[in-house]
Amino acid sequence: MEGFLLNEQTWLQHLKEKRLAYGLSQNRLAVATGITRQYLSDIETGKVKPSEDLQQSLWEALERFNPDAPLEMLFDYVRIRFPTTDVQQVVENILQLKLSYFLHEDYGFYSYSEHYALGDIFVLCSHELDKGVLVELKGRGCRQFESYLLAQQRSWYEFFMDVLVAGGVMKRLDLAINDKTGILNIPVLTEKCQQEECISVFRSFKSYRSGELVRKEEKECMGNTLYIGSLQSEVYFCIYEKDYEQYKKNDIPIEDAEVKNRFEIRLKNERAYYAVRDLLVYDNPEHTAFKIINRYIRFVDKDDSKPRSDWKLNEEWAWFIGNNRERLKLTTKPEPY
């Protein structure tokens, strides 16, 4: 932890300065750490010396209130079908891009006969009205489309409103929650699934561990992924170690990765539509994302003296879903094509 590298006086000064910079009262930080306000006051004035464990707890609690937000949400997969065969109308009126900028190919996917591509933005078309025009944006496609939205001075909300007004049918929507502080311990969550400490309407989960048989600082470099729910259903969750993915794809050292873990809410068809509608009605990503998560799962701590339904909510999970942290924000990360 950052504070452990500093001498005691500097550590205390740094703690207080950071708390004030984050706009936090002593009481709010104390409650989040599980101590009294008076005890925190005594720590800051040097009257008592906190243990190393308490120092670590204070830093972790403090970072949860980081104005830069320990959690952020992105759109990471968007697939929409339009009930028309007029591809130009979809591209120029809905995407608000020039069809002439797209590369045309006389083959398609998902039984479509042809497609247009601009970087990772795909528009599939068919002469059959029941297929219509399909717009597909995977992860990179979403980031590239955000560059165009920025130039158009439009937001995702305005785009989705245009989609629904035009009769667009949501086929898939992935909401990605980036965990920048490593609060989601995926091996622990996997173990909780195995120990029946995941209370869920889902009936299945799958976990994978992949990696290289190399050692970095005496540790195997591995990545963990946890799927909760059936991959064939209209809603399921995928939780994985994003830092390991970035190491594998881009050779970014794991310790330097901006995002530690990612929690993906994967929605299809009607579930995707209701999520978009909820976002447009409430303009509150926190409300939309965690309403879905809380509807389907919660992680608890086993207590053999109580019925399973009365087991206490796991503390780290409670923080993830909203206890004592700043509100989740919808962010964009525009990337040029």
For the regions a language model picked out, list residue spans one by one.
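Structured, helix-rich domain cores that form ligand/interaction pockets
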Residues: 1-10, 17, 21, 64-335
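Alpha-helix N-cap/N′ positions at the starts of helices
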Residues: 10-11, 35
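The alpha-helix within a helix-turn-helix
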Residues: 19, 30, 59
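Short alpha-helical DNA-recognition segment
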Residues: 23-42
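Short, conserved catalytic or interaction motifs in soluble domains
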Residues: 45
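DNA major-groove recognition helix of helix-turn-helix/homeodomain DNA-binding modules
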Residues: 52-68
